[in-house]
Amino acid sequence: MAMGTAVRRVRRWVARLAGVTALALLGTVLGAAGGLWANDAGTPRAEAVTRGGDALWMGHAWVDGRKSQADVAALAAQLRGTGIHDLFVHAGPLANDGRLDPALDPRAAWLVRALHRAIPGVRVQAWLGDVVDTPEGPGMDLSRVDLVPASEQVLADGFDGVHLDLEPVPSGDRGFLRVLAQVHALTSARGRVLSVSVPQTDPLPGLHEVAGLLTNHPKWWSSDYLHQVALRVDQVAVMAYDSALPLPSLFSGYVEQQTRLALAAVPPGVDLLIGLPAYTESTMSHHGSAETVAAAVRGVRLADSGRRLFGVALYVDFTATPEDWAAYREGWVR
């Protein structure tokens, strides 16, 4: 995925992490495969459909000059009749010191205006990301970095909010909570929103600690840490993919589990989104034949409790196929 060096580093980090963590997850989860198959059993409630608060992650081509008004019109037509309300447009990546190079998104202000005209009521957020310091290489130091200037920069371009995707953040990291509190103070004062991408929640208590010992990398968060993060933002998007599971039924059951855990941890006044994998890869952590939009939507619907501030988010616009869009429409928009 060509969205800048930082995003490519995140994808490489995921691939390296998969070598051990995905096997640990696979062994753990397959040991409880009966539970996941049980999660996938049953019939979703008829009311488990979009509330009109869904989202779409969008690539960097929208802000660097590669997209035109014709592309905006085509996107508006594609989104018509769906439940998509938020667009996370990749405006970064951030530098490790938190700065955002203005040369990266020269068409940002134009894009926000064009989207507001073409899709009345849409909320356009600036997707900002970077790799966090890890033993495998330098990155952003969450204990010291200040993301307020970069956030001010994108809000000045007209964005309706800031969507942060900083990876990998260990469960319990205090620096990340500090960063969120600082940016949230800014967005709240400006009448904008702060959204954040988060990893999955421990399928078993303490599993994030086991993964950390095995790999020196985080894979899951504790429910308590997810709750603490959610208290500092307006919107949480769970990246409920890259599960290493080999069958659609297992993946659907896993998404059902992750959705239930997120619903329990994220306060009802915070917007909760469950990410759908609208991309296909063949890696140890992602089996494209299993991790489909249709399977993920089924898992979401099975866990849907009727909460008002709840939806799904498709990742990502430039890899989503007509089949992905059809699965979203038929399974969730209905």
Regions found by a protein language model. Give the residues of each.
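N-terminal Sec-pathway targeting helices
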Residues: 2-26
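C-terminal region of N-terminal signal peptides and the immediate post-cleavage residues
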Residues: 26-50
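Substrate-binding cleft of secreted/luminal carbohydrate-active enzymes
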Residues: 31-39, 241-243, 265-334
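Chitinase-like catalytic core of GlcNAc-active glycosidases
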Residues: 46-73, 78-82, 86, 90-230
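Conserved, mostly hydrophobic/aromatic
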Residues: 87, 164, 236, 274, ...
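Glycoside hydrolase catalytic-domain groove-lining segments
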Residues: 105-110, 188, 241-282
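Alpha-helical structural signal in soluble globular domains
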Residues: 111-118, 153, 182-190, 228, ...
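Short, well-ordered secondary-structure micro-motifs
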Residues: 137, 206-209, 248-249, 284-286, ...
